[in-house]
Amino acid sequence: MLRPRTYVRKLAWRCPRKSQLGLRLATSVSSHKSLPLPMNFDISHSQSAFRAYQDIIHRNKSVGDDEPSQRSENENNPSESDKDSNQDPETPKKDKESENDKEPEKEKDIENDNKVSSESNENVTLASSNTGGAAPPNGNNNGDDPDDSNPSLPVDPVTGLYPPLLAIPMKDRPPLPGRPFAINVTDPEVIRSIYTIIDKREPYFVLFHVKDSNEPDTDVINKKDSVYDIGVHCQIIRHTTPRPGVFNVLGYPLERCKLEELTTPSSEKEAKSEEPSKEDAESFPTSYLKGLNVSYATVKPVEDEPYDKSSAEIRSLVESLKTLLSKMGGKNPLEKLQIKEGTDLISDPSKFADFVGSTIHGDPKKIQEILETLNIETRLSRALELLKVELKASLIKESTIHNLSTKADEYQTRLFIKEFIKELQKRAGISESEDKKTSKFDERLKHLKLTEEAMEAYNAEKAKMENQNEHSSELGVSERYLDWLTSIPWGVYSKDHFNIKQAREVLERDHYGLKDVKDRILEFISLGKVSGKVDGKILCLAGPPGTGKTSIAKSIAESLNRKYVRIAMGGIQDVHEVKGHRRTYVGSIPGRIISALKQAKTSNPLMLIDEIDKLDLSRGGGAASAFLEILDPEQNNSFVDNYIDVKVDLSKVLFVCTANYLGNIPAPLRDRMEIIDVSGYTNNEKIEIAKRHLIPEASKKAGLETNHVSITNETISRLIEKYCRESGLRNVKKLITRIFSKASLKIVEEIEAKEALDSSKEKEGVTASSEEANVNSESTKSNTSQAEPVAESSTDISTKSKVASEKIETKEKKETNKENGQSEEDQQPEPKFVIPEDIKLEITPANLKDYVGPEIYTRDRVYEFPPPGVATGLSYSTSGNGDALYIESILTHSIGSGSGVPGMHVTGSLKDVMKESASIAYSFTKSFMAKNYPDNRFFEAADIHVHCPDGAIPKDGPSAGISFTSSLVSLAINESLPPTVAMTGEITVTGRVLPVGGLREKILGAKRYGCDTIIFPKDIENELEEIPDEVKDGVTFIPVEWYQEVFDKIFPNATAQKCNEVWKEEFAKLDSKKKNKKK
């Protein structure tokens, strides 16, 4: 029994490749000869092939209904013997002889089948095109089957829908019908489904563009709203696996289609829960997609709107597209071939528009608009718009490439010419040393005295530079190194002037007071005059901000006739900022020291290391370690910068450092310095400095003379006492500058008001005179109208000629200024504003607040009559300012209530040392009271809270020890301390008073707060001798060694009986409460 070849081919497409039937069918299909198919196989192993065969028969019937033919009927309806064989597939064959007898008959049947097969295929293709499907392109399915024809899926005649097809989303630009495209699939389920539809010989799927490009990449459509409704119906041409897990599909868009219904994996799972019947599962041809975890969609073919090819609008658009496409071709043969292929489609405007949309690289959303456009004229217009943008971008790209190519050619030409000239000069023996970049460095060397090591480094780098190519990147590195090396003032020194008289005059001129500082500086200069040098000295000016440390360094430089350079240390945290970076780093430069020498242009300047206590030590102190070498006289004669990499002698440099707080400087670095204390100024010193320096400077900057604005001594004193209580003068300078600024404003407003008044009076006078002139002119009008013109006088002629010559000169000046690029306003400076001498302002204590605002310090003391438990201590801040520090102690609960817990807690941003000092004071006070006043049981029940005001300011140090003790003793005996007594000193648990620092500043702070008595440790009594009498005036000093001496001075009226019985009643109440509780 033989089957027609067409049916064999259909079965080969549907049959599993590994089965016996599939192998035989594939062999018979791939063979050019008609091979018989003996029915001796076990059909039970290939039931799917027979089901596929029945589907083919059913499909061919539906396709062939429109154009029936006898041959198609013969092909779709097998003979009765075939049916019998299908009903009984296991019927054995007859013997070989009967089979051989029918051999000629079989050959005839096969030849007829071949004819019928070809005609049937033509009929199927025609039918598919009539039902809305597009003819598939030529190609094969990955080489599995050489035959190119695939059965087209039918469109339901009632609904006009295709059966459900595999639906795949696409985030890239959507494809348009007629142009193949490629997609990568990574979802294993989708890959399995593609294999399935290929095996089923239904290699079709639908592709829809994703609306939101930010959605995660997926090969399954999870929501219908996530994709556009219009997509493309595609056929698989070829598929490959470029790498594991990636499946590449080459598809051919057949036609546009509209999404009607989408089934997602989630919706399919819900449907499965209802357990559909077997008939429902086989209700459509592609029902096998239900078993796969993919999305499939029911789509409807979309046809273009009717149009007229001969329409003028369409023809114009087509011609415009064709013209622009010819310009897009360029010089690329592949692009020319593609564009030629597209221009062949101009007879079909619809396909031509799709071709243009597929060719250009436009926005995916714009391409989707072309896909969704069914009006051909609109589609052509949108394609033309995108093509214009593409052409413009292409022209810009081409122009850019051309410009770059031209520049590269010019560069190569110049390079060739330079090298050619260089070679000619070399052949001719012409020296080119004058043209070398090293000539300027050689000129510098004539004025320098380089060390032997530096000269070797210079010669080596110079030779390296000469041998390098002109365009080498190393050339700039070598040139920059030689520039720095020759910028160091090797062997250049300024002559020192050791004139004590001149130095004293300079110091007195620039600074008032600071007698100790001036004496130390003059001693330093005198040592230099005796020894002939000042090498090896490192001075450190330590004191509060605004006390003139930087200006003192400038005065020293002027006195010695040395260059002055300043290096600010604020924020320096890296050693490379001091010693430079090595040349291996890109953009490396020398450190601050070499840069300062280059700026000074001498090897012995005065180098100010400003704010050395602000060095950042957070990175292990790298910068501080570098200064150990720089500021050590034994080492700085061979300082090596990382960039220069040559020893530089810094022993002739006079280093002067400034610091606000010496505690922030590392101890090894502090030991190398000679410390000079620059203490704060007294009020009298501030007044004199303001009169001598600050007021004249502020007056000059404001453009006012000192006789226009006068500030009395009382005003300056009030300004210092009520606004500026710090040790320095910076705030005083700011406020004086503000006074002159507001005074200038008031003076200008007063002058402008006067001028406005005068101008109004002048206008009134001019109006009156003009009225009189009008009356006189009317009276003489009749006489002058009949008079003959009189000849001009010689005076009038000379006046006119003078005016004319001035105009000519003015015109020439304007032309000259115009040629020089200067305007007339630039040539004429603004005239200085002249202030009349009768305008004067006087700044008095009464009107001072009109210029600087309300007073900051309204009273000298916080407590005029302090309550028990309040003591006045003295503090010394890191900025160098002395201040009063109040210690307040209270009882949180009354003694008689018995609700408090005996003990003490402290507040006020106290750090560890100060907390320990308070704890020591509490322990000593308990011991002191128990020893001297045993009947005073205060500490048995007292819950004490100790506080230091200004809680936002951190406080630390041991100097408040006796202040804590006095506050607790005052609370224990319930007696107040004198308001004008301040104290400072560290306390021990035995009552010994130990020395503290900053006595001078603390004295100034005590005086500012109205304290006239200061208790201090006896061990620092000798420091009083060094403090100026002006600071000590009006203050009584009480040196103490033990706390008992402090107690006797601050509580002179305290008796033993009073101190023992002060809390007697409260403890009686407490005892009675305790007894009642026991009962």
Curated annotation (Swiss-Prot):
Ligand binding (ATP): 543-550
Lon N-terminal domain residues: 165-391
Ranges where the record places region Disordered: 61-158, 262-285, 756-832
Pfam family membership, one: LON_substr_bdg
Low complexity bias (residue ranges): 132-143, 768-779
GO biological process terms, semicolon-separated: cellular response to oxidative stress; chaperone-mediated protein complex assembly; mitochondrion organization; oxidation-dependent protein catabolic process; protein quality control for misfolded or incompletely synthesized proteins
Entry GO terms, CC: mitochondrial matrix
Keyword hit for ATP-binding: yes
GO molecular function: ATP binding; ATP hydrolysis activity; ATP-dependent peptidase activity; sequence-specific DNA binding; serine-type endopeptidase activity; single-stranded DNA binding
Listed Basic and acidic residues bias regions: 61-116, 262-281, 756-765, 803-818
Catalytic reactions of this protein: Hydrolysis of proteins in presence of ATP
Active-site residues, as the UniProt record annotates them: 959, 1002
SUPFAM superfamilies reported in the protein's UniProt record: P-loop containing nucleoside triphosphate hydrolases (SSF52540), PUA domain-like (SSF88697), Ribosomal protein S5 domain 2-like (SSF54211)
EC number(s) recorded for this UniProt protein: 3.4.21.53
Compositional bias segments (type: Polar residues): 117-131, 780-802
Residue intervals of the Lon proteolytic domain: 865-1053
UniProtKB keywords: ATP-binding, DNA-binding, Hydrolase, Mitochondrion, Nucleotide-binding, Protease, Serine protease, Transit peptide
CDD domains listed in its UniProt record: RecA-like_Lon
EC class (word): hydrolase
Subcellular location: Mitochondrion matrix
Primary role: ATP-dependent serine protease that mediates the selective degradation of misfolded, unassembled or oxidatively damaged polypeptides as well as certain short-lived regulatory proteins in the mitochondrial matrix. May also have a chaperone function in the assembly of inner membrane protein complexes. Participates in the regulation of mitochondrial gene expression and in the maintenance of the integrity of the mitochondrial genome. Binds to mitochondrial DNA in a site-specific manner.
UniProt similarity note: Belongs to the peptidase S16 family.
Assembly with partners or alone: Homohexamer or homoheptamer. Organized in a ring with a central cavity.
Official protein name in the record: Lon protease homolog, mitochondrial
Encoding gene, per UniProt annotation: PIM1
